[in-house]
Amino acid sequence: MSLFRRKLPIDLRSIDARRICIIKPSAFGDVVQTLPLLPVLRERFPNATISWAINRGLADLIDGHPQLDQIIPIDRGASLNGWRQLLSQLRREKFDIVFDLQGLLRTAVMTAATRAPLRVGLETAREGSHLPCHMLLPDTGKQVPAHLRYWKV
């Protein structure tokens, strides 16, 4: 199975996902703007386990959120061995859907490492981070705030 596939038109309402991961490691404001996505995902996938990969220093922002089941802490200055351990953990989780909502090279590597059958990224992604994604959330420009943009899920 290839890590990098062609983009497919996918209706997320037709997916029966059991394990979902949000990859949005930083920054404070971006994490806060992503929080409204959790109830949307929970409503759409009521029986799924929802995880969030986030920098350890920001994990307290989401800890205890009622729609979140698991926090995967990321050590920003981790050694190569720490990075490998993180990628191994992401692969072992066997996610059905992964959302790369950061759109950077490091989050693309994390997204690809999951080998999830459905990987969703941002049309505005940089550094080639769209490559491991099957579906891209459209660019809505600055007219639509980030937290509303994610509702397109």
Per-range role (PLM):
Residues 1-153:
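Catalytic machinery of carbohydrate-active enzymes
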